């Protein structure tokens, strides 16, 4: 079947609506929408919930950009895209909770298609979701990964292990030699066996995020915490910033190609701190995190 970009766009807009409704229902605070247009073609809807009861900041962004030619930075590695018009669309979200016992989460699903007359379109899907705890709870990690595995199973036994490994490899801070969190799923360049199969998988990932994350939020959001836990949470959020600005391909691509800076940097935590040569107290819950985020088979 020929790729149907309009069908993908309809799903993504509905996904953004659903996610905002689900997150608002947990928090009680509304999302504020900021609709924007891109000079070169396209636009999007950025939605942000700030200073909520549960979420210090949650951003859910939809974008759909198109143009007559790919930027040079995008065709350098894919010469087959040169001279083609393109469409790129996706939903991405990052949730930074207030309570340090609730992990930060990130999800993204996207579709890309480049066309020129007389040639087959070049297209693919990408996406995934990952979890960044500040205090590790095994039952939360198991639930997160079990949900990821279960949504992958209809697409093949090998899908979850492959995309889990890709996620572990991708969300790695090379300069710190540590994982960003406990991973989840990450996939890109998905275009086989056909459009319908790939689109169905992207939908499963997009819809599966809330099933994976919201039960963890409900379980942890009322846990009492103090200044010490908040202090550690803000310190660890620094790793999130480091990853996004130094290693994340999507952030770098967006900034280098004149993307909408406010939407691209919506993933940043509202408050964060660094501390020179910080060492957690040996044997403390804070010290246990480095062991907890080591790559492992959670299931």
Curated annotation (Swiss-Prot):
A Pfam family reported for this protein in Swiss-Prot or TrEMBL: Coprogen_oxidas
Top-rank EC class of the record's enzyme: oxidoreductase
Site for Important for dimerization, residues: 175
Active site: 106
E.C. number: 1.3.3.3
GO cellular component terms attached to this protein's record: cytoplasm
GO molecular function, one term: protein homodimerization activity
NCBIfam families: PRK05330.1
Reported function: Involved in the heme biosynthesis. Catalyzes the aerobic oxidative decarboxylation of propionate groups of rings A and B of coproporphyrinogen-III to yield the vinyl groups in protoporphyrinogen-IX.
Record-given protein name: Oxygen-dependent coproporphyrinogen-III oxidase
Organism of provenance: Klebsiella pneumoniae (strain 342)
Organismal lineage: Bacteria, Pseudomonadati, Pseudomonadota, Gammaproteobacteria, Enterobacterales
């Amino acid at each position: 079947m020929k790729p149907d970009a309009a069908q993908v766009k309809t799903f993504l807009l509905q996904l953004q609506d659903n996610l905002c409704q689900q997150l608002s229902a947990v928090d009680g605070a509304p999302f504020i929408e900021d609709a924007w247009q891109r000079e070169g073609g396209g636009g999007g809807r950025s939605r942000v919930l700030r200073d909520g009861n549960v979420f210090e900041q949650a951003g859910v962004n939809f974008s759909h950009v198109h143009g007559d030619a790919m930027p040079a930075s995008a065709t350098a590695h894919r010469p087959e895209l040169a001279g083609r018009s393109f469409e790129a669309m996706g939903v991405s979200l990052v949730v930074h909770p207030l309570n340090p016992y609730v992990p930060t989460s990130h999800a993204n699903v996207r579709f890309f298609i480049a066309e020129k007359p007389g040639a087959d379109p070049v297209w693919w899907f990408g996406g995934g979701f990952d979890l960044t705890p500040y205090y590790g709870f095994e039952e939360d990690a198991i639930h997160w990964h079990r949900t990821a595995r279960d949504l992958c199973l209809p697409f093949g036994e090998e899908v979850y292990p492959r995309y889990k490994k890709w996620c572990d490899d991708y969300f790695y801070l090379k300069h710190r030699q540590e994982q960003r969190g406990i991973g989840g799923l990450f996939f890109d360049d998905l275009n086989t066996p056909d459009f319908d199969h790939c689109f169905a998988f992207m939908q499963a990932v997009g819809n599966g995020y809330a099933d994976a994350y919201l039960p963890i939020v409900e379980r942890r959001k009322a846990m009492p915490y103090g200044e010490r836990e908040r202090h550690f949470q803000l310190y660890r959020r620094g790793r999130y910033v480091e990853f996004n600005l130094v290693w994340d391909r999507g952030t770098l691509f967006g900034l280098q190609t004149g993307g909408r800076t406010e939407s691209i940097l919506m993933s940043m935590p509202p408050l964060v701190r660094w501390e020179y040569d910080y060492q957690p107290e040996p044997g403390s819950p804070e010290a246990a995190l480095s062991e907890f985020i080591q790559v492992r088979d959670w299931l």
